[in-house]
Regions:
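RecB-family 4Fe-4S metal-dependent nuclease core
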Residues: 1-366
Length: 366
C-alpha cells in the first residue's frame, strides 16, 4: 500500500511529503505513490539526529523540572545503535564511532550548560503526534486527507506570560544566515495550524487558547572550544608574563621586582592565591553552537496557510490521479536525490519499476 494512503479510504500527507512534492513531483510519485525507497536508507547523520531528538525528549519531560540528562540518554542509545544489525556499516571504523559518540556527548553537555534547566519552561508534551483531517477541492469534486506528523515539544514560557510554543529540534553542521527563510517556512506554518486543534482535542490547552509561536532549536554539530574564557565569556590565548603580573598585583599579592620573576614562579604564585590568569582575548572567537529562532504566525497568516495547503492538496490529488502530468524539476540537487538513478533511466526511456535495478537497490511497498 503506498505510504500516501493510511487505509483504503483515508489518505494522509506529512510536511516532508508536501515539501518533496513542491520540490519535485516525480520524486514524490516514486516515494509516496509507487512506494519506493532505497534499501540502504540508514545513514550516520540520520541515526545521530534521531538520537539527539530522543535525548532531548527525555530531558524535556512534562512539567517544569527536567528529566534524564540528555548526554546519558544519547550515550545509551548510541551504544545500542552501534550494534544494531540494521545500522551495519554506518561507522568507518572504531575511531569514527568514538569521534561521533564524543561529539554527541559534548554537544548535549554544552546545550545544558548554555541553556540551563530552564524552569520557566513548562513542558506540556514532548513528541506529540498529530493527525488532523482537512477537506479540499479536487478538479472534479471534493476529498479529504489527514495532515500527519510529530511536534518535538509543546510548552508554556512562563518568562513570557505563559505563552504557548512549539519547539522543533534541528542539528546542523553550521549556524548561518541560511535560516533567513524561516519567516516563510511552511513546516512552521503547517505545525502551527494543526497544533491548536490537536492540543484542544486532547485537553492539553484551553478551548480558547491558540498556539502562535514555533521555535527552531538549533544545535551545531561541533565540539566545544576548550580554550579558557574570561569573565566576559571571551576565549583567551595563553597568558603571558605581563598577564600574570597584572592579575597578581590587582589581587593585592605583594611581589618585589615582579618583572624579574620567572613565568613558572608567577604561575605558582597565582595557583597559591587561587587566581585564574587569562591572556588576551583571541582574535578569532568561536561561533555560537546553539541558537533558537522564533517563527510566529498570526491568525490571518494561519488562515492563508490553510488556503495554500488546500491548493497544494488539489495539485497533489490531480497528479496522483494522473489528471495532471507528473513533472520533474532538474536542479543541482538532483545528484543528492535518492531516485537519481531511476530518473536517469526514466529519461532514457528504460525505467522498469519491476526490473532488476529496483529489486536490487530499492524496496517497494505492495
Amino acid at each position: 500500500m503506498p505510504e500516501a494512503y493510511s487505509s483504503e479510504t483515508e489518505k494522509h500527507l506529512s510536511a516532508s511529503g508536501r515539501r518533496l512534492f513542491k520540490k519535485c513531483p516525480w520524486a514524490y510519485q516514486m516515494r509516496y505513490v509507487e512506494g519506493i525507497s532505497p534499501i540502504a536508507n540508514i545513514s550516520l547523520p540520520l541515526v545521530f539526529g534521531g538520537l539527539i531528538h530522543e535525548a532531548l525528549e527525555g530531558w524535556y519531560v512534562p512539567g517544569r523540572e527536567r528529566g534524564v540528562p540528555p548526554w546519558e540518554t544519547f550515550k545509551d542509545g548510541f551504544q545500542k545503535a552501534a550494534v544494531d544489525p540494521e545500522n551495519a556499516g554506518i561507522f568507518v571504523d572504531e575511531q569514527d564511532y568514538q569521534v561521533n559518540l564524543d561529539l554527541g556527548l559534548d554537544m548535549l553537555r554544552g546545550y545544558v550548560e548554555h541553556y540551563g534547566e530552564e524552569p520557566h519552561l513548562e513542558v506540556i508534551q514532548p513528541e506529540l503526534e498529530f493527525q488532523v483531517p482537512l477537506k479540499y477541492k479536487t478538479l472534479d469534486g471534493e476529498d479529504r486527507r489527514s495532515i500527519m506528523g510529530f511536534l518535538d515539544l509543546v510548552y508554556r514560557d512562563h518568562s513570557n506570560s505563559g505563552t504557548l510554543h512549539i519547539m522543533e529540534h534541528k542539528t546542523a553542521k553550521s549556524l548561518s544566515n541560511s535560516n533567513q527563510f524561516l519567516p516563510l517556512d511552511e513546516q512552521a506554518s503547517v505545525y502551527l495550524v494543526v497544533a491548536t486543534q490537536t492540543l484542544r482535542d486532547r485537553g492539553l490547552i484551553g478551548s480558547k487558547e491558540v498556539v502562535h509561536n514555533m521555535v527552531y532549536n538549533y544545535l551545531q554539530k561541533t565540539m566545544s572550544d576548550t580554550r579558557p574564557r574570561n569573565p566576559q565569556g571571551l576565549v583567551c590565548n595563553k597568558p603571558k608574563k605581563e598577564h600574570y603580573i597584572a592579575t597578581l598585583l590587582a589581587a593585592g599579592v605583594e611581589m618585589e621586582a615582579p618583572e624579574k620573576i620567572s613565568v613558572k614562579d608567577l604561575t605558582k604564585l597565582a595557583e597559591d592565591a587561587k587566581l585564574t590568569v587569562f591572556g588576551d582575548p583571541s582574535a578569532v572567537q568561536p561561533a555560537p553552537r546553539f541558537a533558537r529562532k522564533l517563527v510566529a504566525r498570526n491568525t490571518k497568516e494561519m488562515k492563508n496557510q490553510v488556503l495554500r495547503l488546500r491548493q497544494d492538496l488539489m495539485m497533489i490529488d490531480a497528479t496522483e490521479r494522473e489528471l495532471l502530468p507528473t513533472i520533474k524539476n532538474p536542479t543541482r540537487d538532483c545528484g543528492f536525490c535518492e531516485f537519481s538513478q531511476l530518473c536517469i533511466l526514466d529519461e532514457q526511456g528504460s525505467l522498469d519499476l519491476d526490473g532488476e535495478l529496483v529489486r536490487r537497490s530499492y524496496t517497494r511497498r505492495s
